[in-house]
Amino acid sequence: MASSDKAFTLDIVTPQKLFFSGEINSVIAPGLNGLFQVLKGHAPLLAALKSGKVRLSLSDRSEDTFQIAGGFFEVSGNKAILLTEEVS
């Protein structure tokens, strides 16, 4: 599918593997002070994450959700990286 003009790249990485790498329209993640959402063009960000649910809105308009065991989230340019110990 063609890249959406609303999409940006997200990598989800655990110590064992690259769990996800692809284009998404948004991500909602569990920050230490509550949920936050990131869209394309977000200001640079580095945030600590607590255990909880992550929701992806994929560029093909589908959604995906999964649990993480805390970690860190970084946004720079139109790329985001979520580092976590475990994803289920």
From Swiss-Prot:
* GO MF: proton-transporting ATP synthase activity, rotational mechanism
Where is it found, in Gene Ontology cellular component terms? plasma membrane; proton-transporting ATP synthase complex
For whether the record's keyword set contains Ion transport, the answer is yes
Its chief place of residence is membrane
* Membrane topology value: Peripheral membrane protein
Q: Which UniProt keywords apply?
A: ATP synthesis, Cell inner membrane, Cell membrane, CF(1), Hydrogen ion transport, Ion transport, Membrane, Transport
Q: What does this protein do?
A: Produces ATP from ADP in the presence of a proton gradient across the membrane.
Subunit structure, interactors included: F-type ATPases have 2 components, CF(1) - the catalytic core - and CF(0) - the membrane proton channel. CF(1) has five subunits: alpha(3), beta(3), gamma(1), delta(1), epsilon(1). CF(0) has three main subunits: a, b and c.
This chain belongs to the protein called ATP synthase epsilon chain
State the species of origin.
Answer: Chlorobaculum tepidum (strain ATCC 49652 / DSM 12025 / NBRC 103806 / TLS) (Chlorobium tepidum)
Q: Which gene encodes it?
A: atpC
